[in-house]
């Protein structure tokens, strides 16, 4: 489990200053200590940063790359892309490889206006108009609220800022979940999406085998007793420093690599070892216990439903019915492209196969047999095997 890795990390880090361990450390990548705006500027791209306030009061940080390094002199509006990250991540992970291998930068260089959101509750979106992050009520959200409030709020902001009525949506993992919920329940929002690109879509969650699923065997009462009812896996500076040391060591980086395999599936040859410290330093960024319980609900119920509040009375209060509503994927009309990984132990090929017949607007599907759950954003061969296809589909559905 995550806490076992972190404990081991801290114990090992206590020895790093002894003997020759320091001689085995690679030079730390400067992006380890940078936020998203700083990473963008460091790579030579224009950076803009905005705060978006949702209808229910959450203040979300959104980053923008308005144009690429090769399009600085061109004028006129560019097609807009919005990117939504996975659980425990932030929007920096669209940019954590070198510029020629990061989807956010490649899209900007291909002529797109790139926007990247941060989900409520992560390090960069942990503010509210009236609530404090110490309030339990602040953390009473799951991907339901991210779909109902965050995504519409951010898209409205982008439309107003750019003057463009339609945009492309790219989601990874839980980012796809947010998109599918929003586009299947809000037709007016769906009409603003030119195409939905789903990378490792987390909808069916019946067959995961990764280490994180062991956590879902615990009763809700135990999870709440251990982790409380507020934030979950929030960013910790001491852990960040420790994990950076481990992942940057020429021998001990294998611990990071092995943990990633347990979490996401094995495909070590496709990960850039020299960037391991960057990957680990930007995660976890946190979410809510409430959100984790909703994902656990998907695992146990095998149904794509809204959050179950645990009793008929509370469900009636939230949904005007005794059971949480099922999200009907067949109602989504947005043209959709899906990529799945054959070695993905979190979103398995079996689970992806189960949802394909429900997506009536599926225009493209590809299974990458050797990919794990992280290859969609960090894979060395992602630019050739997937990113080029995304750009080609965008041009086809312009």
Curated annotation (Swiss-Prot):
Disulfide bonds: 247-256
Superkingdom to which the source organism belongs: Eukaryota
Enzyme class name: hydrolase
Expression across tissues: Highly expressed in the epidermis in the granular keratinocytes. Also detected in other tissues, although at much lower levels, including lung and spleen.
Glycan-bearing residues: 272
Chief location bin: secreted
UniProt key word Protease: no
Gene3D superfamilies referenced in this protein's UniProt entry, alphabetically: alpha/beta hydrolase (3.40.50.1820)
Pfam families found in the cross-reference section: Abhydrolase_1
One GO cellular component, as annotated: extracellular region
Signal sequence, renumbered to the chain: 1-18
One GO-annotated biological process of the protein: lipid catabolic process
EC assignment: 3.1.1.13, 3.1.1.3
Catalytic site: 173 (nucleophile), 344 (charge relay system), 373 (charge relay system)
Residues of the AB hydrolase-1 domain: 79-379
Catalyzed reactions per annotation: a sterol ester + H2O = a sterol + a fatty acid + H(+); a triacylglycerol + H2O = a 1,2-diacylglycerol + a fatty acid + H(+); a triacylglycerol + H2O = a diacylglycerol + a fatty acid + H(+); a cholesterol ester + H2O = cholesterol + a fatty acid + H(+)
Keywords linked to the UniProt accession: Disulfide bond, Glycoprotein, Hydrolase, Ichthyosis, Lipid degradation, Lipid metabolism, Secreted, Signal
PANTHER family for this protein: LYSOSOMAL ACID LIPASE-RELATED (PTHR11005)
Recorded family membership: Belongs to the AB hydrolase superfamily. Lipase family.
Protein name: Lipase member N
Native species: Homo sapiens
């Amino acid at each position: 489990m995550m806490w076992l890795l972190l404990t081991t990390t801290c114990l090992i880090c206590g020895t790093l200053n002894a003997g020759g361990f320091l001689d085995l450390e690679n030079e730390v990548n400067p992006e380890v200590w940078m936020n998203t705006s700083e990473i963008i500027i460091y790579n030579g791209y224009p950076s803009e940063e905005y705060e978006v306030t949702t209808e229910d009061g959450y203040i979300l940080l959104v980053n923008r790359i308005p144009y690429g390094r090769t399009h600085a002199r061109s004028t006129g509006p560019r097609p807009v892309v919005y990117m939504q990250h996975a659980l425990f991540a932030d929007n920096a992970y669209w940019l954590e490889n070198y510029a020629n291998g990061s989807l956010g930068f490649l899209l900007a260089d291909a002529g797109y206006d790139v926007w990247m959101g941060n989900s409520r509750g992560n390090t960069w979106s942990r503010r509210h108009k009236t609530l404090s992050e110490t309030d339990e009520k602040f953390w009473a959200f799951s991907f339901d609220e991210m779909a109902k409030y965050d995504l519409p709020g951010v898209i409205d902001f982008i439309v107003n800022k750019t003057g463009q009525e339609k945009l492309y949506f790219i989601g990874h993992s839980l980012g796809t979940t947010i998109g599918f919920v929003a586009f299947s329940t809000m037709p007016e929002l769906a009409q603003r999406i030119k195409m939905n690109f789903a990378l490792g879509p987390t909808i069916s969650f019946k067959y995961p085998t990764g280490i994180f699923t062991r956590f879902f065997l615990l009763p809700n009462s135990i999870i709440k007793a251990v982790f409380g009812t507020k934030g979950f896996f929030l960013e910790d500076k001491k852990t960040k420093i420790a994990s950076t040391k481990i992942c940057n060591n020429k021998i001990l980086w294998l611990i990071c690599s092995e943990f990633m395999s347990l979490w996401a599936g094995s495909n070590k040859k496709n990960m850039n070892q020299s960037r391991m410290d960057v990957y680990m330093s930007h995660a976890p960024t946190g979410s809510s216990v409430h959100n984790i319980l909703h994902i656990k609900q998907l695992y146990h119920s095998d149904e794509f439903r809204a959050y179950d509040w645990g009793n008929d009375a509370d469900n009636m209060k939230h949904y005007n019915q005794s059971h949480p509503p099922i999200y009907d994927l067949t109602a989504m009309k947005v043209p959709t492209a899906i990529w799945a990984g054959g070695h993905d132990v979190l979103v398995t090929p079996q689970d992806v196969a189960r949802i394909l017949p429900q997506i009536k607007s599926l225009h493209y599907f590809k299974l990458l047999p050797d990919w794990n759950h992280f290859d969609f954003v960090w894979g060395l061969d992602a630019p050739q095997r997937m990113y080029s296809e995304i750009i080609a589909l965008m041009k086809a559905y312009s």
